[in-house]
């Protein structure tokens, strides 16, 4: 207790951010509470830390926050959109600003990255328990039984959806994989063996999500890592044709289905994208309103005949953001992602995870966003904004 009393406000906020890193993917309500507590402490007792000039990327983040807030005026349910904006965007902005100003030492950053990867392993352990010992009541929603009759379960864990777990694992694999490469180059065999084992666990879990979009994102992410970091990584892509040629189970069936548009999920996506484009045409400036897609879509629906089926998002990041908050908001969001990744690459003195971690995370978001909208999940988005804030802390420190 004496040690707790001696902690400064600065240290309390940092430990709350560490706790949020652990809780966001495992216990989201706990992560939200910790972020809000940290934000209140900073606002009440440490406001002076946030004074001073802002980086242009921080101004872009502010513009995105304001623009999404203004979009609420177009919502068919303004009260709902306002509450949802507070639950999502306000918390994203809070964790971004806190990470920017409190991950301000090398020791804190290393602890955060270590905890981030450890949390990924814990998520995988929980997902493994779910996969082997729990019966999913939603499997019929995630699998086309006509085209994949042998696929009886998919891994989702505490992320509550296979695609969301896949997106989260791509984030952790991007950071952890680069950390493993760094350890290999430094010949730190003990750390390399530990991280290599963790990567294998996470890769296996990613495979068991049976999420085709996330598999494709992983392949593109590995390709980019091979071009930017280590050319020998490109040989890993040879695993894909080998699996398709020699293995004929459900994994290969899902992979082959990428080249076919016959299953219902693909046909549904085409119909959703078509309807969403009409929304963008009708609301070209501020969109239909933050988190108003599921309320507005029935007016544009021509594919789903069951009125009880609710479509929460467009299964496409670009179309969904453009429809809800306008094309300008989409441009701001893309500028945030690409700007942070590009600025992180500029520091030649930084380690590999620092220089290219945000690049690989951005690639995974942009590629998976072509087929799904995993950022609709507050858990996944909060992790992304935490990483963006971490990147900004490094950018500000060196600029």
List each language-model region with its residue ranges.
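Membrane-embedded alpha-helical segments of multi-pass membrane proteins
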Residues: 26-46, 85-96, 165-173, 215-223, ...
């Amino acid at each position: 207790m004496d040690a707790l009393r001696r902690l400064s406000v600065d240290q309390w906020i940092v430990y709350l951010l560490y706790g949020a890193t652990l809780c966001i993917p495992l216990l989201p309500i706990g992560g939200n509470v910790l972020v809000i507590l940290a934000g209140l402490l900073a606002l009440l007792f440490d406001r002076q830390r946030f004074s001073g000039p802002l980086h242009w990327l921080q101004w872009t983040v502010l513009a995105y926050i304001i623009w999404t807030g203004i979009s609420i005026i177009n919502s068919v349910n303004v009260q709902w959109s306002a509450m949802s904006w507070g639950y999502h965007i306000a918390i994203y902005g809070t964790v971004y600003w806190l990470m920017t100003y409190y991950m301000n030492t090398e020791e804190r950053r290393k602890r955060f990255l270590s905890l981030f990867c450890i949390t990924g392993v814990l998520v995988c352990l929980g997902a493994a328990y779910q996969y082997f010992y729990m019966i999913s009541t939603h499997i019929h929603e995630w699998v086309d039984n006509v085209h994949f009759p042998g696929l009886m379960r998919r891994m989702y864990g505490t992320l509550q959806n296979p695609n969301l777990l896949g997106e989260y694992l791509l984030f952790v694999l991007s950071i952890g994989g680069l950390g493993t490469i760094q350890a290999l180059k430094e010949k730190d065999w003990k750390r390399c063996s530990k991280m290599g084992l963790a990567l294998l666990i996470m890769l296996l879990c990613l495979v068991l999500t049976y999420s085709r979009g996330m598999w494709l994102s992983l392949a593109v992410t590995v390709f980019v890592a091979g071009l930017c970091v280590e050319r020998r990584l490109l040989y890993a892509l040879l695993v894909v044709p080998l699996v398709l040629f020699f293995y004929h189970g459900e994994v290969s069936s899902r992979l082959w289905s990428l080249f076919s548009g016959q299953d219902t999920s693909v046909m549904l996506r085409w119909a959703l994208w078509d309807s969403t484009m009409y929304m963008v045409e009708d609301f070209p400036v501020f969109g239909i309103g933050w988190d108003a897609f599921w309320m507005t879509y029935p007016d544009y629906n021509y594919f789903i005949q069951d009125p009880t089926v609710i479509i929460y998002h467009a299964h496409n990041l670009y179309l969904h953001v453009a429809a809800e908050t306008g094309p300008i908001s989409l441009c701001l969001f893309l500028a945030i992602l690409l700007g942070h990744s590009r600025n992180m690459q500029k520091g030649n003195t930084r380690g590999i995870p620092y220089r290219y971690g945000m690049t690989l995370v951005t690639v995974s978001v942009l590629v998976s966003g072509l087929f799904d909208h995993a950022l609709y999940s507050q858990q996944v988005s909060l992790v992304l904004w935490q990483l963006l804030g971490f990147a900004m802390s490094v950018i500000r420190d060196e600029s």
